[in-house]
Amino acid sequence: MVSGITGRKSMIKVITLQHIYGKNRERMTDLLKTLVENELKNLEVKVEISITPENWAEFSLEGEDEEVSANFLISRYGTPAVKAEAGRTYRGFLQAFGDNAFLVNIGIPVRVETEELIALGSGRPAQLASRFGLIPHLPVEVEVFEVNKKVKTRFTKKQLDLWWSWKKAGTDRVIVNAATRSEIKSAIKKTGHGRDIYEIERIGLLEHAIVCRENTDGPGIVAAIGPRLKSEMGVVIGDAR
């Protein structure tokens, strides 16, 4: 049976790497259930969702296509790691920015130390996070390159390239967590900034990037929509502006 799957006869349970967080956990859970049901709509399977004590989304799958559905969910969302192995790449999310490291949760907590953040430029972790608009709960990809007395981790080239593409862009980006796309669109519309943005990029389930137009300042968008959203926000100032 595939890792991440537990089951008994006629039902399979899958714990995913989708973290349920924020003040409105019920809303986030319902949103994820609706999203997954839509993704599995062509399969014969009944979907139920619950939250584990560690705040991961767990799916109970029942039906003719339950195993196919389980494999899809593991591929789509990943499963929490129970240990870190050298040479492996893991999906996870940003948890916090300490004095000497980015803290990442891959199912277990790992640290990306300051010396592994050189690719983002000079500065302390909190300064680097601010420069690239990074906030807690953003999905990330890390590589474990050593496991001895402690686990040594770095961000993958793919991850670093994404952040640098934001920084080198000709427009600002506003990074938002704990909000749906429709909530962000509504906040932008109600504050009269509909013509000031190009699009809203999806980063995760409730994590998005608002792509500003060339003459729009990201901090101004944050000041306008911030009071309407129960979110943390980061701003990436495009260097090519």
PLM regions: where:
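Ser/Thr-Pro-rich, acidic low-complexity intrinsically disordered regions of eukaryotic RNA-binding
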Residues: T29-D30, A101-L103
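Short boundary/loop segments of OB/S1/cold-shock single-stranded nucleic-acid-binding domains
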Residues: E67-T89, A129-R131
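OB-fold/S1-family RNA-binding modules
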Residues: I5-I74, F132-R241
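Structural detector for short beta-strands of small beta-barrel domains
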Residues: A84-N100, V140-V142
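Beta-strand/loop nucleic-acid-binding surfaces
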Residues: P109-G133
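Short, structured patches in soluble enzyme cores that scaffold and shape functional sites
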Residues: A96, I106, E116, V144-E146
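Short, acidic/hydrophobic/Gly-rich beta-strand patch recurrent on exposed beta strands
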Residues: S60-E62, L103-P109
